[in-house]
């Protein structure tokens, strides 16, 4: 049995909408799948559907329509809140299905369908769901859970109280928690709802929507503190990476560059906090100063704009020993990352060959103990086991500096997310920002234009 985490399933659901496979169609296929599994086991009978406020309830409403020959009742534990659930409930009402608000006095059905919370549940159940779970478990009805039993954590398999299903009908792939809590899942049926296998391996707006985090009760620094270490022969690269991190959501970005170019880098924007480290180049003698800066930041981005500096790689290798998270680009890319550091490497083909030779990219990621985001017309992202491909972007992005922007975006996401998901989200967002630029300027835009397009690209991702 193949598995997919609840997060990756939600990402895939959003990406399907972007690729033209609507959530409405997926819900239709899911609800029909539930009905099919019921009708494999029963020819007739009374069915009571317990529906929550989200799309799990929507799946239940669709199932009601497909249960031909059954006496179906729908109980709303909460009013539907999603557009799809509202629409499918309205169809049920128009079709004449009895719809009642709240819990029944008793369960007198042959079959109960749990379409209450699905994969959205975490922690202790609130009312009326807690009472509903008790009622369902105490009944003699055949119990069918939609996607996962209500109360069960879909990933960890943990629960305090959960529907003890005789049958769980899940979609696309099983959720990991189903294998860890067989005592409440019963038989597990995995239904194909029409998602092409290739979609699971493509980056899209769903990746961005889940990696970009904004907390209503946050204070400065909560959304991430990034340290950019680079510069030397080039001044624009560290500035672009720093600005990209800010535009992608990081609260604080410090740019550490050689003293010789500090004023030039600072002149790019009043939003930059620029620290001079070393004189003409960043060298091993500056390590202690850099290590103090590392302690005050969540993520280190290193390598852009360094140019010819034989000591820089050694500086990076030492910094990684005290660093929890890092994004390494250009001259900062190393072939092995210590276990204490969660790391994204962002080479283009030439840089990849320089560091890893002709090693296949998945094997290189395993060897490096890092996520590799291999830049190209189609970006490849892998941690050695998982692989995703990004197809956003256009030929205008061959202009210099777009890779620096990508590194900054990846760092912003990595502040509050894991390396693989951050890299996937960064690759798509960077390309989408390029597509936003193309709509405005054609192919003739710069990396500065790309940075300024990041907020609009984020809004587009969140609209799906």
From Swiss-Prot:
Residues 205-464 are annotated as: ADP-dependent (S)-NAD(P)H-hydrate dehydratase. GO terms for biological process: metabolite repair; nicotinamide nucleotide metabolic process. The keyword Nucleotide-binding applies. It comes from the Archaea. Residues 348-354 are annotated as: NADPHX 2. It catalyses: (6S)-NADHX + ADP = AMP + phosphate + NADH + H(+); (6S)-NADPHX + ADP = AMP + phosphate + NADPH + H(+); (6R)-NADHX = (6S)-NADHX; (6R)-NADPHX = (6S)-NADPHX. (6S)-NADPHX 2 binds at residues 305, 404. Binds 1 potassium ion per subunit. One of its GO terms (molecular function) is NAD(P)HX epimerase activity. InterPro entries: CARKD, Nnr, Ribokinase-like, YjeF_N_dom, YjeF_N_dom_sf. K(+) binds at residues 56, 114, 150. (6S)-NADPHX 1 binds at residues 129, 147. Keywords: ATP-binding, Isomerase, Lyase, Metal-binding, Multifunctional enzyme, NAD, NADP, Nucleotide-binding, Potassium. Signal peptide: none annotated. Its EC number is 4.2.1.136, 5.1.99.6. Its cofactor is K(+). Residues 55-59, 118-124 are annotated as: NADPHX 1. In the N-terminal section; belongs to the NnrE/AIBP family. HAMAP family: NADHX_dehydratase, NADHX_epimerase. Bifunctional enzyme that catalyzes the epimerization of the S- and R-forms of NAD(P)HX and the dehydration of the S-form of NAD(P)HX at the expense of ADP, which is converted to AMP. This allows the repair of both epimers of NAD(P)HX, a damaged form of NAD(P)H that is a result of enzymatic or heat-dependent hydration. This is Bifunctional NAD(P)H-hydrate repair enzyme Nnr.
């Amino acid at each position: 049995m193949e598995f997919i985490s609840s997060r990756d399933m939600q990402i895939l659901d959003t990406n399907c909408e972007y690729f033209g496979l609507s959530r409405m169609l997926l819900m239709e296929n899911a609800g029909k799948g539930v009905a099919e599994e019921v009708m494999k086991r029963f020819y007739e009978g009374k069915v009571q559907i317990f529906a929550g406020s989200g799309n799990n309830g929507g799946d239940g409403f669709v199932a009601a329509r497909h249960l031909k020959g059954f006496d179906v009742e729908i109980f709303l534990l909460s009013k539907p809140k999603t557009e799809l659930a509202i629409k499918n409930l309205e169809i049920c009402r128009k079709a004449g299905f009895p719809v009642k608000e709240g819990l029944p006095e008793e369960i007198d059905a042959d079959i109960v369908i749990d379409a209450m919370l699905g994969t959205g549940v975490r922690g202790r159940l609130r009312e009326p769901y807690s009472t509903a779970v008790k009622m369902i478990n105490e009944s003699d009805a055949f119990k069918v859970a939609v996607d996962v039993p209500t109360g069960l954590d879909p990933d960890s398999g943990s629960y305090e109280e959960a529907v003890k299903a005789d049958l769980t009908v899940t979609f696309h792939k099983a959720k990991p928690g189903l294998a860890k809590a067989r005592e409440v899942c019963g038989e597990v049926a995995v239904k194909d709802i029409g998602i092409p296998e290739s979609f699971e391996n493509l980056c899209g707006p769903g990746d961005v929507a889940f990696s970009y985090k904004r907390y209503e009760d946050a204070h400065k620094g909560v959304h991430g503190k990034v340290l950019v270490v680079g510069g030397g022969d080039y001044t624009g690269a560290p500035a672009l990476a720093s600005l990209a991190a800010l535009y992608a959501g990081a609260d604080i970005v410090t740019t550490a560059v050689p003293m010789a170019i500090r004023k030039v880098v600072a002149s790019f924007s009043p939003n930059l906090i620029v620290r001079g480290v070393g004189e003409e180049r960043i060298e091993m003698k500056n390590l202690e100063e850099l290590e103090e800066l590392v302690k005050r930041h969540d993520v280190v981005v290193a390598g852009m704009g360094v140019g010819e500096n034989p000591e820089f790689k050694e500086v990076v290798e030492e910094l990684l020993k005290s660093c929890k998270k890092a994004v390494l680009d250009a001259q900062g890319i190393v072939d092995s990352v210590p276990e204490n550091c969660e790391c994204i490497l962002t080479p283009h083909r030439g840089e990849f060959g320089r560091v890893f030779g002709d090693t296949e990219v998945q094997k290189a990621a395993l060897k490096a103990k890092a996520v590799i985001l291999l830049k190209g017309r189609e970006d490849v992202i892998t941690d050695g086991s998982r692989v995703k491909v990004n197809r956003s972007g256009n030929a205008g992005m061959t202009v210099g500096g777009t890779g620096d922007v990508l590194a900054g975006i990846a760092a912003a996401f990595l502040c509050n997310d894991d390396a693989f998901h951050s890299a996937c989200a960064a690759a798509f967002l960077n390309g989408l920002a390029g597509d936003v630029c193309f709509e405005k300027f054609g192919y003739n835009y710069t990396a500065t234009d790309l940075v300024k397009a990041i907020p609009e690209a984020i809004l587009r991702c969140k609209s799906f």
